[in-house]
Swiss-Prot record:
Keywords, in A-Z order: Disulfide bond, Sporulation, Toxin, Virulence
GO molecular function, one term: toxin activity
Membrane-spanning ranges: none
Region described as Pore-forming domain: 156-370
Function according to Swiss-Prot or TrEMBL: Component of a binary toxin active against Culex and some Aedes mosquito larvae; mortality towards both C.quinquefasciatus and A.atropalpus is maximal by 48 hours. A.aegypti is not very susceptible to this toxin. Binary toxin internalization into host gut cells requires both proteins.
Keyword Cell inner membrane: no
Name of the protein described by the UniProt record: Binary larvicide subunit BinA
Lineage: Bacteria, Bacillati, Bacillota, Bacilli, Bacillales
Coiled coil: none
Family to which the UniProt record says this protein belongs: Belongs to the toxin_10 family.
Amino acid sequence: MRNLDFIDSFIPTEGKYIRVMDFYNSEYPFCIHAPSAPNGDIMTEICSRENNQYFIFFPTDDGRVIIANRHNGSVFTGEATSVVSDIYTGSPLQFFREVKRTMETYYLAIQNPESATDVRALEPHSHELPSRLYYTNNIENNSNILISNKEQIYLTLPSLPENEQYPKTPVLSGIDDIGPNQSEKSIIGSTLIPCIMVSDFISLGERMKTTPYYYVKHTQYWQSMWSALFPPGSKETKTEKSGITDTSQISMTDGINVSIGADFGLRFGNKTFGIKGGFTYDTKTQITNTSQLLIETTYTREYTNTENFPVRYTGYVLASEFTLHRSDGTQVNTIPWVALNDNYTTIARYPHFASEPLLGNTKIITDDQN
């Protein structure tokens, strides 16, 4: 996991400041001003440091930014000829590039999704106030598109928890010890996620001011499935579970726009698609390679004690737990999103020198689709 210093240097400048932007070439400071409500025009106004003139640039994996207004969380959204303020959906027309022209100036460019060569910049319609922001293909020698940061306020990022070693397998202390229901939990990774991509009862406008970045924490532990004392040479059938419940899958998708694929990789929706690389890197997960979602499956498995003495066996499966937190550490989803991965199982035993039980027939008896 990246520590805070690394995160601070890893996130581009776009993600670390609250900005007031003005057009550099104007005779008077023309600051970009978002409407009070979504679905309105982005305008230029006299710089007044109103809440509508403060913006956060949320960076994506490919270097583009999502420009969100601090007042209500609405974002720059491209239309046919101009840019408006709208609710964030993950549309390609909500991703802009900040192109540096000089040390002090840059322009905001957007690419036409239907044409790789059609790159347009934002330009005021006129030098009269107020003025709408329009697109122009006149970029090369056009000083009217240049923007500078009239003011930048440093954005405090959440402190992420430190990574820990992978969870240790529980050890049984005696023939009557069934072991813990769960092993000690280990933090595997954590990642920042913009507030516009998550679901919370706090209004989006309030989130932009108090917790513009949330974080997702990935924890792992060993979950007990069963425990039994096997007489010498005995065979027993045990019930085990794998996957994730439908309730948790839906809740996770609603909460962070991420779900878990059938191969235990992460599947990203439109809102989070632009940060999937950084998200999986930081949380020590992978992007799914399947279109199928993970479901909960129940198995029966036969185990045989091949020893000539009684052995206590306790079966464990690796659990991956995801939780969403505000910048102050408060957990948003009171019930964690948990997936049990039966590709990673272990059996604790006592006496410790006993061999593992012999695995026999395995049968799927139920899943979420039946």
